[in-house]
């Protein structure tokens, strides 16, 4: 399958886009076709073995329109050219329409003045007054009309061409309506001439008042005025992305062979050393090699506070170096940069169609033929009821010019384009219109714990000394832990470094599996580990041990430290909750969304996190491979589910969910399994994404309502339905004005989304009274049986294990379980602190528990 984007020319309304879509969709091999009227583009997914680009272009041309392959973004400037090509085209269209409008007004104003002046009492030259000058009066109007028709000839060229091809569009309605007025006006000139020849002044007077040239000219000018305003508004729909692309630098300072030089951005190569000075834009994505800086990433990630950068940190192209000087190595250039990927994602999203637009698409396909039929029937009906030709003709013209298929075609894409652009500015990348629509109806948000609710990195939360002083305890602990590879050790070392404490000399370092580490710190034997280690070495301190248990109840991991047989204190380490997680969860709950947390932790730790952030429900002890099953279980219960995860370990769950949201993507925005990508690691952006989705869908519904309501009311009024009862009849010029402004209204309403701002409240998390009403449940990992080739029954059991802290621990447990007779396979997972074993019927739970305990760890439960 291949997916390509095409630029389509000649479309003017929803009927045009509908015809192009149908023409391509019926080609053999075409799987999916989406035409975007706003962007004049088409995305086609097709089977290359059955269909080619040339055949697709030929199908569009046969339908009466032009098509060409869309330029593919390359480097940042190329991306800018490709994406802003639409903006440039919109700007050119606006410029052309302004010229057409100015020239049209140049002739329409005197035409209108001449035709209406005698009725309004305006001064007119004597040669235009009185019945004796009727021919001069009529012919001058005709001459003033001709340049207006020529200036707006495109309506006739396209309108009659599509009518001839039996696929009439909005231009057909304009061409038919104005042509009817012109033909009748020419007929009136002949009748005036005949009247003069026969000296029939009554005929002269009658047709002198029924010329309709001013109606034809004014209709064309008013529609051009509306299209000018529409073109201006359309140009603003892509403002967000245009401004984003404007940030991309055109040049970069590169250092090659010790020589600095300024080169065009497209010449930057992978691995180049680049120099970025204060006030300059970061040219491409890369890694800081030397120097420090404060970088403003707000344009890409929505993060308002500048981010401090130093050697080893990543930087994103198109962000601004606010202060400092640094050297960087280019790691992503051209189409691979975050900026280019953002442009591509937004471009694809704005080219896609939301399911909500399907009704409008169906109506657009038959709208124009139905309107023409109504106009013919209305004209004939009024003639048959004895009304004058002038009256019946004005009815028919009014029906033709008031009908507006454009509003139907613009209702959805304008809101989608502005909404996705606004999301991109806030660091929220929505990949498709369908994802945007689905998000607004989500009623359950599932959050992965690690890295989503929490920081994903252990930090020191509590330091409790046993009398030797906090700094002394940290210094001793960090000195010993510095030799360990354990993740919790890194947290203690980082805390000591942050406080600039002294690291002491350590000898005879030793790791004790399942317990901790030991060594001599400046000649004194130091033990560091869990409570089991303290008990094994007969070290007691009831007060400190009790405090450790209390910290464990809060979901923290207490590490005890003893010096020469005496407990000197404990340090608690935990993966702490992000500052905004509780607020974000409270906001989601206030929007009527149930929040569920999935975690591999045991129920005790899960409950501690739940109490901190106020989630509605927690599913604990979930293995990474089982997250997708939990999502499916929620969906089977009738829930519309959004899954929020890191996009890597959670890929199956993200793909299974109705909406997959990858959080904290940073520069990696092309996460395949996600429908929405959040560049920041902030749960508040989930709330923002839901609010934005609801705002966009509400806007689309407003637009569609207006488009249907306008036509449903306007067409009957124009047809004279209310004339017998209320003498309500629409002038064709008023109909043209109404039609022009209906499209302008739809686009202008969509532009309101440019000022969308998420409402974030400082809401406190819901209070949880006690674990008894916690809503924490253990994942449904039922024991599964299967028959092997020999007919033996293998069972799968899941063991929850305490005490594992690193990959060494994982290896120890795996070896211990694999050595148990009857165990076919053992898989140990550090994140969920569990082991999944495949065993035959002879293996007992007691044997598995004994194997884990003998390895120095604790088997908490076996399922």
Where are the model-predicted features located?
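Flexible metal-binding regulatory segments at protein termini and peripheral loops
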Residues: 1-136, 148, 234, 243, ...
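Conserved ATP-binding TGD loop and adjacent catalytic N/P-domain core of P-type ATPases
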Residues: 2, 18, 442, 521-523, ...
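Residue-level signature of catalytic and energy-coupling elements of molecular machines
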Residues: 13, 20, 24, 44, ...
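Conserved cytosolic catalytic loops of P-type ATPases
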Residues: 28-37, 41-46, 50, 211-213, ...
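Actuator/coupling domain of P-type ATPases
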Residues: 55, 61-70, 74-81, 85, ...
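ATP-driven catalytic headpiece of P-type ATPases
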Residues: 99, 443-485, 515-596, 675-676, ...
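Membrane-embedded alpha-helical bundles of multi-pass transporters
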Residues: 120-136, 164, 183, 422, ...
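Hydrophobic alpha-helical transmembrane segments
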Residues: 143-155, 162-165, 179, 215-244, ...
């Amino acid at each position: 399958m291949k997916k390509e984007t095409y630029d389509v020319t000649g479309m003017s309304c929803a009927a045009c886009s509908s015809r192009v879509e149908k023409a391509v969709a019926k080609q053999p091999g075409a799987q999916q076709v989406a035409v975007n009227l706003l962007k004049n583009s088409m995305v086609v997914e097709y089977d290359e073995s059955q269909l080619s680009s040339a055949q697709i272009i030929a199908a569009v041309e046969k339908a009466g329109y032009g098509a060409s392959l869309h330029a593919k973004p390359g480097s940042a400037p190329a991306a800018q050219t490709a994406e802003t090509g639409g903006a440039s085209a919109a700007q050119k269209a606006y410029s052309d329409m302004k010229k057409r409008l100015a020239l049209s007004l140049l002739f329409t104003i005197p035409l209108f003045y001449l035709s209406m002046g005698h009725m309004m009492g305006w001064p007119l030259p004597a040669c235009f007054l009185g019945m004796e000058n009727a021919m001069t009066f009529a012919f001058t109007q005709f001459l003033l009309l001709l340049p207006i028709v020529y200036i707006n000839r495109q309506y006739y060229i396209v309108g009659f061409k599509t009518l001839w091809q039996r696929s009439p569009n909005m231009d057909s309605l304009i061409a038919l309506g104005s042509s009817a007025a012109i033909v009748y006006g020419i007929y009136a000139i002949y009748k005036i001439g005949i009247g003069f020849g026969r000296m029939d002044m009554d005929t002269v007077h009658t047709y002198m008042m029924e010329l309709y040239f001013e109606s034809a000219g004014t209709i064309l000018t008013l529609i051009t005025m509306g299209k000018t305003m529409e073109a201006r508004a359309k140009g603003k729909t892509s403002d967000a992305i245009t401004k984003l692309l404007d940030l991309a630098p055109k040049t970069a300072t590169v250092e090659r062979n010790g020589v600095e030089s300024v080169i065009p951005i497209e010449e930057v190569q992978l691995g180049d050393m680049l120099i970025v000075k204060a006030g300059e834009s970061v040219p491409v994505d890369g890694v800081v090699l030397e120097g420090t800086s404060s970088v403003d990433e707000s344009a890409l990630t929505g993060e308002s506070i500048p981010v401090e950068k130093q050697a080893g940190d990543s930087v994103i192209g198109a962000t601004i170096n606010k202060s400092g000087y640094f050297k960087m190595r280019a790691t992503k250039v051209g189409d691979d940069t975050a900026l280019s990927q953002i442009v591509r994602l937004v471009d694809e999203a704005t080219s896609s169609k939301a399911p909500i637009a399907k009704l409008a698409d169906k109506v657009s396909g038959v709208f124009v033929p139905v309107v023409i039929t109504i106009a013919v029937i209305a004209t004939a009906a009024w003639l048959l009821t004895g009304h004058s030709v002038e009256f019946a003709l004005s009815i028919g013209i009014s029906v033709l010019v008031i009908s507006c298929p454009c509003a139907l075609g613009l209702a959805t894409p304008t809101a989608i384009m502005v909404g996705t652009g606004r999301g991109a500015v806030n660091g929220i990348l929505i990949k498709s219109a369908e994802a945007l629509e689905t998000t607004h109806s989500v009623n359950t948000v599932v959050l992965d714990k690690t890295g989503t609710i929490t920081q994903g990195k252990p930090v020191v939360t509590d330091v409790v000394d046993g009398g030797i002083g906090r700094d002394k305890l940290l210094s001793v602990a960090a000195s010993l832990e510095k030799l360990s590879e354990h993740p919790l050790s890194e947290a203690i070392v980082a805390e000591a470094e942050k406080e600039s404490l002294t690291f002491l000399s350590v000898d005879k370092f030793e790791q004790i599996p399942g317990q901790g580490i030991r060594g001599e710190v400046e000649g004194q034997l130091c033990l560091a580990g869990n409570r089991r280690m303290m008990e094994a070495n007969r070290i007691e301190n009831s007060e400190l041990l009790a405090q450790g248990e209390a910290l464990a109840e809060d979901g923290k991991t207490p590490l005890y430290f003893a010096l020469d047989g005496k407990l000197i204190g404990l340090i608690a380490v935990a993966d702490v909750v992000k500052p905004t997680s509780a607020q974000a969860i409270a906001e989601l709950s206030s929007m009527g969304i149930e929040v569920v947390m999935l975690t591999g932790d045991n129920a005790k730790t899960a409950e501690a996190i739940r109490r901190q952030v106020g989630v509605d429900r927690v599913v604990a002890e979930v293995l990474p491979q089982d997250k997708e099953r939990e999502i499916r279980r929620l969906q089977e219960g009738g829930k519309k589910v959004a899954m929020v995860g890191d996009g890597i370990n959670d890929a199956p769950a993200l793909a299974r969910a109705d909406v997959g949201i990858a959080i904290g993507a940073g520069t990696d925005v092309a996460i395949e399994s996600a429908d929405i990508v959040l560049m920041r690691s902030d749960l508040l952006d989930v709330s923002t994404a839901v609010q934005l989705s609801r705002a966009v869908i509400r806007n689309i519904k407003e637009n569609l309502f207006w488009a249907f309501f306008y036509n449903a009311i306007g067409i009957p009024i124009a047809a004279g339905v209310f004339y017998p009862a209320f003498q309500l009849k629409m002038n064709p010029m008023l109909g043209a004005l109404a039609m022009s402004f209906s499209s302008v209204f739809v686009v202008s309403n969509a532009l309101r989304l440019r000022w969308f701002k998420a409402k974030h409240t400082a809401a406190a998390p819901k209070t949880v009274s006690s674990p008894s009403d916690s809503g924490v449940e253990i994942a449904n990992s039922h024991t599964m049986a299967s028959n092997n080739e020999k007919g033996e029954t293998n069972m799968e059991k899941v063991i929850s294990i305490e005490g594992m802290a690193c990959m060494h621990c994982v290896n120890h447990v795996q070896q211990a379980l694999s050595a148990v007779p009857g165990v076919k396979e053992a898989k140990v997972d550090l994140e969920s602190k569990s082991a999944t074993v495949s065993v035959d019927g002879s293996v007992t739970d007691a044997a598995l528990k004994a194997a884990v305990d003998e390895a120095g760890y604790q088997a908490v439960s076996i399922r």
